[in-house]
Amino acid sequence: TTYLNIHELRKEMGSPNLDLCTEEIEEIPYLVSLSDRKIPITFFRIPNKEKQSAIVFIHGGGYIGGSTLVLQNQCRFLAEQSGATVISIDYRLAPEAPFPAAFDDCKDVVKWLVHHADHWNIDPNNLSIAGESAGGTLAVSCGLSEVGKYLKLVIPIYGALDVCSASDLDYWDYDLYDVIPEHKKYVITRLNRFRNLNGT
């Protein structure tokens, strides 16, 4: 039996990326203290005195990896381009913290932000949530939960939202999608990883 080395897998997540910001962006790490645990978050914002809208951004990583560090430049750029305060959540990861730990962390951070909005100079009536991959799924889950009433907008970026069984995925055909010819083999190899996870 081959076992997955979770620590090695986590080290491989993310890829080098550029900081595209042209303005100064503040990064403020903070530890949200709840009655039973602490959740690390990071605020990204243009440093000014104005009350800002807020975007909670949830990283991807298949619920087993990823972190704010992987998407640091993306969060900085989102803050610069939107003028909003971006809050990245370092939710608990599986397998050390199985479901619903990540979901609970994200929901609890949204609640905490609403109750501490004045302290962080954010507008609790203009709070959105976004995420990519597993983070997109967590964002939608938050939007459908009891904290959804606080959210003005939910933005899933390629979240796992299809409820079809793996046997229903045979319609997939790579030829239906335009790919730069020299990148095709690489793209197919990457996409096949997801199909192989489902045994299809």
Model-based region annotation:
Residues 2-14:
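Short, basic/low-complexity N-terminal boundary segments at the transition from targeting/disordered tails
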Residues 4-5, 19-200:
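Alpha/beta-hydrolase superfamily serine-hydrolase fold, recognizing
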